Amino acid sequence: MIKTVNISILAVLVIALGASSCKKEDEESGETGGCMDVNSPHYSSSATYDNGTCEFLYVTDYELTSYEDIDWDLLINVDADVYIKVKRQSSSSWEFSSNTIDNADPNTVQIWSAPNQFQLLNETYVWELFDADNPPIDEDDAMASGSFNPVASGNNGVVVSESSDGLTIVKIHYSLH
C-alpha cells in the first residue's frame, strides 16, 4: 500500500516537473504559443509558434431577421418572395444562393440552412436580398444589401449584418472547428 502511494506521488511530481519545465523553456526562449492563422478568431499576432489553438468559422445557417415591409410585387398586399446571395467581396461567384421563400411574412424570421458548411475567412463578405418576381414579369427587385467580416464581427456563433439603410438585418450562424 505504501509502495503504491509512493509511486503515485512520484508520478504526480514527474508530470508536474515535466509540465513546468516546458513552460519554463518557452519563457526562457522567448517563444509565445498561439494561433498564427489570421482566418481564425483565436489569431494572435504575438504568437511565434502555432500551439494548435486555431479554430475556424463554418457557416451553418442564414437568417433574415427583418426587412422593409412594403409591397414589392405588382399586386397589392403581396408579401415579398425573398432569396439571399452571399459571397466574398473579392469574388465574382456567389458562395451561397438560397432558394426562394414565397410570400415571406416580414414579421417572421426566415432561415435557410447552408447546403455546404464552407469556411468563413477573415475577409469582407457581401450579401444581397432580392424579391423574386413570380411569375417573372420583370427583373427581380433588389431589396437590400450589406457587408460583414465574420472573423472580426462574429460573436457566440453569430455574425449580425445590417443593411446600409438600417432596415434589414441578416444573421449568419456558424460553428467553430
What are these regions (language model features)?
Residues 1-20:
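Sec-dependent bacterial lipoprotein signal peptides
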Residues 15-44, 48-58:
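Bacterial Sec-dependent N-terminal signal peptides
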Residues 74-88:
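Short, ordered, surface-exposed loop/turn motifs in non-cytosolic proteins
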Residues 131-177:
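C2-type phospholipid-binding modules
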